[in-house]
Amino acid sequence: MNAPRPHDLLWGMPVSGLPTDAPQWALEVLASGQPVVVRRATCEAGWVAVGLRGHGRAQRLGALMRLTDIQRQQGPEALRVHGQSPWPALQALASVTPVLQARGLAWGPTGGVGYQLATGMEVVHAGSDLDLLLRTPRPLARAQARELLDILDCAPCRIDVQLETPSGAVALREWASFALRVLLKSPHGPRLVSDPWAVMERAP
């Protein structure tokens, strides 16, 4: 099993792994065998930072999971939409799949769309956005980022793409802008950087 990465879904976390003051909905999530999602945070060896997802944005909980409890692991790259859907977010995923495949980079859906595709649970609705992760181990030219964003903005719903670099993640929309510095989400917290692929620079 590979080391868990942000946005991976993990199965196997026991209810006993939750803090004693965890809300009832979180206990029910684990008791029903639902996965948790890997968060971008540092923790002690042998543990991984995860998040639990309930109904709606109000039901979110951060926790820690033992690596030895992981029974199954699935990354966004393994998730694809099959068949037709009435929901714009899933329609958007189907429409942009050829565009992203042509880039030759690893990518996949995260957020509600990824969760639904991985679990079969109906969490996507008419107002859902599409969240995508695009692994970019090498620098992506800002002109290329703008070209890709122009294509994605023609989809039937808003698409938010995170470019996963060796140092962390940056929003495609922000990298495609003309900002001198962009927000890089790293395991050690957010940083403003001029180059997300270079050594992280702390904003003054």
Swiss-Prot record:
Stored InterPro entries: Holo-ACP_synthase, MdcG_C, MdcG_N
Function recorded in the entry: Transfers 2'-(5-triphosphoribosyl)-3'-dephosphocoenzyme-A to the apo-[acyl-carrier-protein] of the malonate decarboxylase to yield holo-[acyl-carrier-protein].
Highest taxon of the lineage: Bacteria
Name of the protein in question: Phosphoribosyl-dephospho-CoA transferase
Cystine residue pairs: none
HAMAP family named among the record's database cross-references: Malonate_MdcG (MF_00650)
EC number: 2.7.7.66
Reaction it catalyzes: apo-[malonate decarboxylase ACP] + 2'-(5''-triphospho-alpha-D-ribosyl)-3'-dephospho-CoA = holo-[malonate decarboxylase ACP] + diphosphate
Active site (UniProt): D129, D131
Keywords for this protein: Nucleotidyltransferase, Transferase
Record GO terms (molecular function): nucleotidyltransferase activity
NCBIfam families, A to Z: malonate_mdcG (TIGR03135), PRK01293.1 (NF002332)
Family, similarity comment: Belongs to the MdcG family.
Organism for this UniProt entry: Pseudomonas putida
